[in-house]
């Protein structure tokens, strides 16, 4: 069952709707399922419908159709369609055809039956019953304008076609159901195919949206005002959510505005829509057709509705702007045609507005917050009412308590919302609502950069092979971009590239690589990128071992074997050019890269040319099979032994065998009686000696001498090396030939009649040994030179060439750099990535095959020199020096910068002289010791580990000669007036100047040279500084600075005023006293603090309290009258002086108090008997017994009185609680409170409150019971 409160998922994407048709027409109902291949049943009144003459059933992919032919009133009723567990019901209503009206009889065939109404009228019209559609007589249904409750897609109501006259306004509306959406839908409006209307919002086009919280329906509107003919055309509305998408197309027709004198009656009667074309308006008579009264009526309606023909109501735009919020000013101004709105809006902003102060919030939220993804954020407000309730909203919807994601805190007047584990879904607008007030903020969730933890690997493939690039990033679900040669690979190229995600792993797959796919591929994330190279080579088949000629005897086995580079390549065996068909005697095998042809029981018919042709390659491997026929001739008995070979004699051909292959020497022999066969192998070579001629050997001039060898007898009949002898032949076999088996073998046959001997030379060849590790040199930006030595042993065959491989140091994949063998012992490798460490290795190749790889070279990193520095300029020139400055090169590269070199040369000379030994890291330099008057060119080069980069040279020669410049002081504006500083403050006066050569600077004060350690002067080539660490009054005065070059000079005067607090006024005295008034007089202070006295402060103090109160402040005169004194009190008076620094530290005060007497009356205070208010403690409200629940704070209260204030003590079961931090005791206005924090059952017992003072003691007690919650 579906979960409660959730809508079950329907199996239909498109549901059939109820229809109303006329009798005799056909009704068509369509349904679309979520996936194809679903069994769908159609029912009427609970019974299944089958295909017959009445009902037509059709299914095409996801689309299923029911057609009711020749509908009659009997076909009315309830129908249903069922797919799986989903069932949708709909109704069919059949009506009698209406009689044709007279007006319609005059309309030509093909005229439209109804005139579409404008979109504004469609919205105001009353919709017909839910789900109904009107069906024409040809069976085509038109959707009703009303919105069905069960939407198709995401729309509740789709925007409809509309018409408007030029200058009019129209509104297109779309409603989207939001009950099942987790986030607000995103709606985009388009005109034509690609024009996004959000970029065209302005005076004539506006987009509005709203949300009805009660019905949970989103309303999106497109407002077009002052429509023009260019506004006509097709529009599209697209709505999308997280996992759903829907769109709707609609049209807007704009008619020309028709005045009362412009209406052409004849053209109005002409039909303006052509068959098979869109609507168009034409005033020419050539395009006119038959009269069309509906068109005339339509133009009449549009003429009446034309907004330009009606007098618009007067609107006070100024009043609307005054009542609107500032964010709506620009929209209202554009809407009412006010284009130059800057001055009115400026005036409106300048008007005084009564800003309403927030009464609910004391501290609001900040305008915006930012938090990293996965972190926690706290949003805090402070309320005016601590007991007020708050609501937190996210994008307008209230946040509910859900686990540990949202935490609501309330501490006093503070309200806090804590969001844990922030994700991108938390990036939203938040509001805190208190009553009718609210404050808003924006939360921005910042994603940490996605790093690449495993980089891409270089790959080398053949054409047609599968390529897969793989990388690993730091986060799952991260978005990555794949690029080829800097161009992003988009999803539109999925027919060639396939993108795959597996957790943190990302794959780029090319199913069949072509030559065009070669290049540099990169994967880019928000935190970096990784680059790899793909090299695609055309398929080229290499033959590691070719087939060889064979010579075998009858009934023997012949084996042809070859080895190629590609184990997937198949081939065909040919015999004399014809394909060889395998049978029981002839077998063909293919294991890995080895192809083998085996012929058992060889016969003379098998002697032929055999070839192996690989499929798909224009090459073949050929060999010949020789059949050795043994001829038996009749010989008399006592025949001497004879060895029958193809090359008899003392120098037979050398027999070559590959290491690991089987060596079989089949030697036919004859003799009677049967001879004895002896096989021997030469072990060591002896001395040279003369030898007699062999009896059967041909005469040869050079055959009179031969070498004498020490020989090893071979007589084993089993094992790896064995000898098998029969009557007519002797077979010498070596299983798995090795290097030690190489040498000269001697076959000797003997019988009583004589003997015969033959030497056979066997040579064992192998693949070469691995070369030594290659050496790397001439490392450049993307290239290097690789050098190596030949292998120590070439395998018995000359080395044909070498194969070079490289890999990234942190990778495990080696990539081949050449397919054609390298003949030289060096190679320049290119197309490497700068800044990536590489290793190289080399293979040696001979006729047998490829050697093992050499050890890897030392790691190296291709690094190119940096670019040339920029903006080289001459900063200063003197008689022997030139000051240069420049900026870093635009391209630094992976090698960084080690420094810069500076060189110079004479004009017209090509020899450059270094200006300094080594490099400098600074970007400026002073070149010294240059010849005066010389014209020199300067150049600067940047260096790194790869060497120097390109130089930058001064554009013109520089003449080494001092340029005389008149001295001039550039006195800052703030130093041209009196400089005021307080005592103790530092003084730092910087005065820039100009002049060449360097001017001489002189400071004087009052015409005297400056002296003393407190004032210091610091000079540089461009400015001078006067510095005083702590200013004193004696530093005040007039300073003069002079810069001089020979007989030229410039002066400037500075006035420094050091100010301090003034001294107190002098000679304060009381001039007169009368009534409630006192007249005071004093003299100005002796020291005014080196600045003007701003005023005085007069204070009075009552003799009884001696608390001073200010009477006059900032008073500028030296006499005053203090009024409103109290009769009978005595007063003291004092006066402070003030200047710009502050008030004087001391005041001038009157020595004797001034008494204000009551005239004529002497007051005698009454005598009273002193009362004793002391009282012993007593409890006015004793403690009461309580029963509380454990874990919740508890309070015990009582009230006590007594004088003097009694001392309070609390006890529990006789123990004093004053030292226990779990108990808090309060006393306010005689009310005593004991707070027990989170009590436990152990806190139960008898509590006593005791009050004690000098008059006595009192106490009260109660019993506290702590219950454990059930």
UniProtKB/Swiss-Prot annotation:
The modification Omega-N-methylarginine is found at residue 1237. Pfam families: fn3 (PF00041), I-set (PF07679), THB (PF18362). GO terms for cellular component: A band; cytoskeleton; myofibril; myosin filament; sarcomere. Substrate for phosphorylation by PKA and PKC. Reversible phosphorylation appears to modulate contraction. Polyubiquitinated. CDD domains: FN3, Ig, Ig_C5_MyBP-C, Ig_Titin_like, IgI_C1_MyBP-C_like, IgI_C2_MyBP-C-like. This is Myosin-binding protein C, cardiac-type. It comes from the Eukaryota. The gene is Mybpc3. It comes from Mus musculus (Mouse). The keyword Cell cycle does not apply. PROSITE patterns: FN3, IG_LIKE. Residues 94-105 have a biased composition (Basic and acidic residues). Disulfide bonds join 432-439. The keyword Cytoplasm does not apply. InterPro entries: FN3_dom, FN3_sf, Ig-like_dom, Ig-like_dom_sf, Ig-like_fold, Ig_I-set, Ig_sub, Ig_sub2.
């Amino acid at each position: 069952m579906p979960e409660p409160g959730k809508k079950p998922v329907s199996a239909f994407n498109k549901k059939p709707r109820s229809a109303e048709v006329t009798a005799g027409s056909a009704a068509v109902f369509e349904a679309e399922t979520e996936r194809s291949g679903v069994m769908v049943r159609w029912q009427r009144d609970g019974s299944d419908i089958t295909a017959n003459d009445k009902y037509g059933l059709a299914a095409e992919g996801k689309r299923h159709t029911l057609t009711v032919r020749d509908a009659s009133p009997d076909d009315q009723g309830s129908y249903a369609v069922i797919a799986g567990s989903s069932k949708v019901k709909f109704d069919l209503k059949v009506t009698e055809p209406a009689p044709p009206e007279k007006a319609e009889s005059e309309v030509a065939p093909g005229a439209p039956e109804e005139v579409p109404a404008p979109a504004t009228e469609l919205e105001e019209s009353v919709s017909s019953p839910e789900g109904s559609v009107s069906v024409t007589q040809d069976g085509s249904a038109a959707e009703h304008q009303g919105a069905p409750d069960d939407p198709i897609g995401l729309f509740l109501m789709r925007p409809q076609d509309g018409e408007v006259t030029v200058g009019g306004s129209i509104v297109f509306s779309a409603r989207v159901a939001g009950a099942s959406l987790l986030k607000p839908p995103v709606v985009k409006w388009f005109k034509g195919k690609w024009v996004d209307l959000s970029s065209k919002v302005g005076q004539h086009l506006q987009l509005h949206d709203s949300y009805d919280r009660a019905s949970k329906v989103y309303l999106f509107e497109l407002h077009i005002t002052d429509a023009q003919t260019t506004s006509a055309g097709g529009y599209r509305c697209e709505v999308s959510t997280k996992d759903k998408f829907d769109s709707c197309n609609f049209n807007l027709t704009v008619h020309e505005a028709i005045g009362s004198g412009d209406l052409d009656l004849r053209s109005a009667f002409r039909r303006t829509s052509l068959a098979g074309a869109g609507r168009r308006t034409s005033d020419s008579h050539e395009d006119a057709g038959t009269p069309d009264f509906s068109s005339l009526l339509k133009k009449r309606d549009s003429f009446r509705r034309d907004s330009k023909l009606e007098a618009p109501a007067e609107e006070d735009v100024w009043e609307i702007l005054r009542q609107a919020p500032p964010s709506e000013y620009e929209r209202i101004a554009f809407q009412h045609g006010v284009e130059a709105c800057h001055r009115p809006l400026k005036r409106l902003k300048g008007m005084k507005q009564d800003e309403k102060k927030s009464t609910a919030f004391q501290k609001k939220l900040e305008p915006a917050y930012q938090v990293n993804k996965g972190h926690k954020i706290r949003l805090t407000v402070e309320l005016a009412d601590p007991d007020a309730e708050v609501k937190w909203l996210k994008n307008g919807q209230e946040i509910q308590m859900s686990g540990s994601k949202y935490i609501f805190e309330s501490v006093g007047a503070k309200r806090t919302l804590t969001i844990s584990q922030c994700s991108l879904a938390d990036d939203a607008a938040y509001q805190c609502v208190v009553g009718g007030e609210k404050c808003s903020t924006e939360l921005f969730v910042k994603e940490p950069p996605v790093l690449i933890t495993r980089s891409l690997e270089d790959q080398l493939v053949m054409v047609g092979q599968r390529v897969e690039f793989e990388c690993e990033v730091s986060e799952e679900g991260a978005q990555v971009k794949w690029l080829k040669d800097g161009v992003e690979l988009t999803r539109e190229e999925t027919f060639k590239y396939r993108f795959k995600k597996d957790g943190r792993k990302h794959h780029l797959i090319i199913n069949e690589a072509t030559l065009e796919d070669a290049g540099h591929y990169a994967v880019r994330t928000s935190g970096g990128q990784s680059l790899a190279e793909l090299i695609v080579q055309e398929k080229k088949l290499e033959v590691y071992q070719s087939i060889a000629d064979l010579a075998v005897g009858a009934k023997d086995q012949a084996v042809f074997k070859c080895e190629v580079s590609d184990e997937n390549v198949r081939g065909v065996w040919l015999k004399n050019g014809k394909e060889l068909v395998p049978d029981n005697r002839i077998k063909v095998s293919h294991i890995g890269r080895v192809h083998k042809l085996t012929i058992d029981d060889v016969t003379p018919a098998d002697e032929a040319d055999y070839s192996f042709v690989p499929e798909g390659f224009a090459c073949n491997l050929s060999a010949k099979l020789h059949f050795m026929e043994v001829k038996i001739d009749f010989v008399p008995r006592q025949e001497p032994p004879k060895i029958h070979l193809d090359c008899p004699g003392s120098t037979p051909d050398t027999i070559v065998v590959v290491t690991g292959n089987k060596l079989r020497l089949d030697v036919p022999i004859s003799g009677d009686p049967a001879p004895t066969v002896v096989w021997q192998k030469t072990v060591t070579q002896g001395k040279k000696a003369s030898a007699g001629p062999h009896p059967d050997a041909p005469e040869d001039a050079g055959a009179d001498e031969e070498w004498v060898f020490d020989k090893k007898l071979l007589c084993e009949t089993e094992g790896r090396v064995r000898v098998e002898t029969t009557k007519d032949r002797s077979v010498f076999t070596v299983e798995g030939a090795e290097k030690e088996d190489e040498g000269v073998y001697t076959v000797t046959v003997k019988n009583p009649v004589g003997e015969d001997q033959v030497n056979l030379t066997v040579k064992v060849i192998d693949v070469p040994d691995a070369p030594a590790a290659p050496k790397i040199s001439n490392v450049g930006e993307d290239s290097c030179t690789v050098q190596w030595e030949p292998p120590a042993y070439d395998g018995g065959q000359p080395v044909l060439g070498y194969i070079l491989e490289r890999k990234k140091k942190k990778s495990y994949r080696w990539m081949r750099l050449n397919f054609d063998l390298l003949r030289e012992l060096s190679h320049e490798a290119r197309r490497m990535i700068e800044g990536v460490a590489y290793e190289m290795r080399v293979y040696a190749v001979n006729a047998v095959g490829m050697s093992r790889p050499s050890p890897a070279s030392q790691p190296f990193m291709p690094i190119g020199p940096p670019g040339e520095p920029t903006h080289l300029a001459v900063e200063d020139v003197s008689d022997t020096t030139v000051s240069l400055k420049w900026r870093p090169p635009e391209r630094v590269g992976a090698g960084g910068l080690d420094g810069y070199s500076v060189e110079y040369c004479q004009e017209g000379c090509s020899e450059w002289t270094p200006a300094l030994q080594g490099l400098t890291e600074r970007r400026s330099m002073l070149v010294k010791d240059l010849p005066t008057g010389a014209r020199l060119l300067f150049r600067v080069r940047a260096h790194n580990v790869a060497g120097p980069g390109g130089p930058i040279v001064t554009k013109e020669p520089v003449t080494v000669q001092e340029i005389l410049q008149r001295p001039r002081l550039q006195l800052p504006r703030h130093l041209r007036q009196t400089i005021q500083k307080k005592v103790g403050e530092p003084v730092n006066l910087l005065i820039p100047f100009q002049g060449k050569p360097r001017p001489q600077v002189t400071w004087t004060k009052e015409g005297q040279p400056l002296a003393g350690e407190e004032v210091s002067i610091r000079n540089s080539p461009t400015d001078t500084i006067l510095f005083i660490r702590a200013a004193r009054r004696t530093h005040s005065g007039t300073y003069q600075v002079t810069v001089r070059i020979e007989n030229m000079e410039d002066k400037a005067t500075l006035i420094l005023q050091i100010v301090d607090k003034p001294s107190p006024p002098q000679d304060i005295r009381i001039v007169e006293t009368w009534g409630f008034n006192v007249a005071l007089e004093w003299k100005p202070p002796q020291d005014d603090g080196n600045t003007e006295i701003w005023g005085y402060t007069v204070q009075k103090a009552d003799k009884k309290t001696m608390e001073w109160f200010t009477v006059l402040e900032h008073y500028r005169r030296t006499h005053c009258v203090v009024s409103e004194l109290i009769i009978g009190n005595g007063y003291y008076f004092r006066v402070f002086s003030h200047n710009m620094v502050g008030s004087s530290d001391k005041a001038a005060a009157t020595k004797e108090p001034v008494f204000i007497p009551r005239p004529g009356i002497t007051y005698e205070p009454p005598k009273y008997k002193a009362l004793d208010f002391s009282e012993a403690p007593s409890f006015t409200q004793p403690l009461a017994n309580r029963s509380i629940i454990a874990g919740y704070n508890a309070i015990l209260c009582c009230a006590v009185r007594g004088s003097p204030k009694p001392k309070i003590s609390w006890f529990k079961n006789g123990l004093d609680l004053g030292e226990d931090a779990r108990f808090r005791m309060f006393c306010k206005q005689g009310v005593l409170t004991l707070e027990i924090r989170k009590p436990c059952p152990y806190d139960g017992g008898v509590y006593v409150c005791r009050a004690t003072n000098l008059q006595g003691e009192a106490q009260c007690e109660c019993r506290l019971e702590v219950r454990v919650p059930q």
